Amino acid sequence: MRKTVFLHFVPKYLLSFALSLLAVYSSAENISSRLTVDMTTDKACYIPGQSVVFVLSGNVPANTMVRYRHGSAILETHKLSEVMSNNKWSWTPPMADYQGYLVEVYTETTNQSTILGTIAVDVSSDWKRFPRYGFVADFDNAGGSIDKNANIKSEMAYLNRLHINGVQFQDWQWMHHKPVKLDAHGSLIPWYQDISNRWVGVEYVKNYIAEQHKYGMKSIFYNLCFGAWKNAVNDGVKTDWALLKKDGSGNFYQDYHGLPSSWASNIYLQVPGNMDWQQYMAERNTEIYSHFDFDGFQIDQLGYRGDVYDARHKVVDLPASYKSFIQAMKSAHPDKDLIMNAVSGYGADNIVSSDVDFCYNEVWGNGNGYGGVSEADFANLLGIIQANDKYSDHQRQTVFAAYINYDKADNGGSGDKMVNTPGVLLTDAVIAALGGSHLEMGDHMLTREYFPAAPLAMSDALKTAMVRYYDFQTAYQNFLRGTTSKAAYLPVVSTSSNYSVNAWPPKSYSITTFAKKVGNCDVLHFLNFLNTDDLSWRDVWGTRTFPDKYTGIPITVTANRKIDKVWAASPDSHAGAVQELAFTQKGDDVSFVLPSLEFWTMVVMEGSNDEDHVYITGEAVQLDGHAAYDLAYAVPMTNKGEGKVFKVTTYLKANELFKFTNGRDWRYCKSYCAEYKDYQFNSFVSLAHITTLGEDFKFMVPEAGYYDITIDLEKMRVYLTKADLSGLSAIIADKSPSGEFASWYSVSGVPVDKPRKGIYVRNGRKVLF
């Protein structure tokens, strides 16, 4: 027989109602587009309080309007003629930081808006919150035959139109171990040759930086963390810093990255964790920052190198060395940004958990000889984002260096020598829908790991499409990247059409869906794989074809809550403008018509708080005689009007598993799981992230007892500590004063039929059961 412990307590009894959702109907907004207007902004991103200056080109009717949106919400609307003078006007966004906006120029009749043009605005005080990374890699004027400074202005104007907020300078330096070339007096030498014998003009490096800073972009220089040219000993590099390998006979030699014989040198590797090497490179970086106005350092590596050793023939842990190198660079220049490449994921856990500003993954089809596993499929990209989120404690964004049309580019730009537009757009659609970003844009589109190479050209149509796609990922950045992968889930979606619909990962000849919970919104992505069985993002030979564009697809989504509004937007339609959709809701089913699908359409369902209940289930709370995951006996958590925060004090068995759900029916409810298998709370670990996507990993505690458990579904976190029961005194009470068995309630006043170990209220007193 269990003893019950009471403490006098007068609860505020709450009456709860279980209301089934009635049918809800909503009408649609009619929208069309006639994209005759182009716009630019004076910066790629803005800090809160800055005004945005727009310049418009193209003819507009007299009744043209302009409106500013955050998501579907319209913040302001004006007659364009009242705010614009000489094709220019300004707008000051709200003061909120890290927000994306879409500006729509349109005309309107009684029943329809016609979009003439759109442009995005990013208000972010720090670019690392929503990085959109570009590159530059050419600093020559071809012997004076081209106007390089004019090219710099036009190239950066285009990157500004794409809202690129950070630019990587590839192959800008002189020698890897001595990037800045100085004369005997310590002054910059105006011209030098890089490792491939290309000429680099210091003037042009500086002018790129100045032009980028004008637009609010960050300028990041590139270098290896462990590279030196031949004869580097003449510049102070010590032989005992060398990274060594061992041949088949057991002889040690310095590891190196071989390059063509026509180039200036191979690259000879040093131990990145060697403190003397770190000091040497920190001094070189001081020279860089003293002569160039760079904002940070893009650190590179070469992936898995096999077994490697230091000068004393001790094994070197390269990933640990990378982390040490990053920390040394940050200590030397704490105000500068740092990014490091995780080549095929090598060393990612050490890199991402160190002091980098965001995650940067160079992905390959087969590890590219670097020892990595294949990352060629679209499905791999989500796994990389999830891993980065875990390694960074969900603090850092992911940028992919993913080279499109690689084999076509590597074979001299075979065929038409053009980048394949549908290959680019589907890859960019998937990366953005998953919450990532794609390093691809510079003075050309990146198709190879050697950034100066430009074997494939962009068509004008692709350049325009890039504007649409970068506008889209900037305007809707809060819906795409405002939460991490722990807020992702696999939506339950069906269609009455003949088209196949499946939840992530992509499936041949199907519409693939992916979703995230963002605030009070379910953000659903529809990705078009209906016309293809090619599930690789690489499109290596540039053979992907344009998909058919589908319209009027009937969709039904299981929502589990009351939906107030449904809207759609696509970079492929109406320049990304919002289109409100008619919908019906019957019970848990929300039905609407997807207006169009070419590569990618995003649908957002706005509604009330969907988490009215949260329960704990599993072996750790299992009742005798009942299955561990019988939701009828799950432990209910209570919400005291604290938004999406639920709490309970309950008994947990030692070393047994548990997780959380938002319902009592496995057919419809959502599970909130751990990110790691058998995640253990203890006296040192009281916080964990939860996720609704991926493996069904669960939590445990090492010691049986009563625990205070809090789950926050806004932050997607769970907090767990041992309960303090010192204030409770033991009083046995089985019946109420009237002699009848008293009813049980949770602490917040919810009736409980079957009390279990935990704190409840009975007969006006708090009970430890």
Residue ranges and their predicted role:
Residues 131, 137-148, 221, 225-292:
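Active-site-adjacent "subsite" loops/lids of carbohydrate-active enzymes
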